[in-house]
Swiss-Prot record:
Belongs to the UreE family. HAMAP family: UreE (MF_00822). It holds the Pfam family UreE_C. It comes from Sinorhizobium fredii (strain NBRC 101917 / NGR234). The keyword Metal-binding does not apply. One of its GO terms (molecular function) is nickel cation binding. This is Urease accessory protein UreE. Its main location: cytoplasm. Disulfide bonds: none annotated. InterPro entries: UreE (IPR012406), UreE_C_dom (IPR007864), UreE_N (IPR004029), UreE_N_sf (IPR036118).
């Protein structure tokens, strides 16, 4: 019989040691109701009231007690290196303008591999290398609402 979870907890004290783990890509971590396959081949039915974006280390609280830890899977990414700090801002702007998920550090940006975007970035003077690591992009401005609203076409001042 599968486990069932209807509650997500942020990583906490050691007294919440997980029974098992589930490893998910960035896209797989955005969900509401799904049967998840654990690393030990058990399954857990995640059944939430609304869609969430799970983070690495989050805990799925199991009915009847216990926790399942969420781990971010390693993914095929591009590591983008700018010439300098101002160039990093310019590159981040171009990626944001295309609504791409991005993890931004002080000296690099990570995105999911896309050859068209790679060519654009190299054309803008960036150094782009392949990387394989967990992907933790920034959460968007609309993250807390459970759904995504842009308002495109509704704001006469939107560019």
């Amino acid at each position: 019989m599968p486990y069932r979870s209807t509650e997500i907890l942020s990583p906490g004290p050691a007294d919440k040691a997980p029974l098992h783990r589930v490893t998910l890509t960035h896209d797989q971590r955005h969900l509401r109701r799904k049967l998840l396959h654990l690393e030990n081949d058990d399954v857990v039915m995640l059944d939430l009231k609304e869609a969430v974006m799970l983070a690495d280390g989050d805990l799925l609280a199991l009915e009847g007690g216990g926790y399942i830890e969420v781990k971010a899977a390693e993914e095929a990414l591009y590591e983008i290196r700018p010439r300098d700090r101002l160039h990093l801002i310019e590159l981040a702007w171009h990626l944001g303008n295309r609504h791409l998920a991005a993890a931004i550090d002080e000296g690099r940006i990570l995105i999911v591999r896309d050859p068209v975007i790679r060519a654009m970035l190299e054309g803008l003077g960036a150094t782009v290398n392949e990387a394989v690591e967990p992907f933790h992009p920034l959460r968007g401005a609309y993250h807390g609402t459970g759904h995504h609203h842009h308002g495109h076409g509704h704001d006469p001042h939107h560019g």
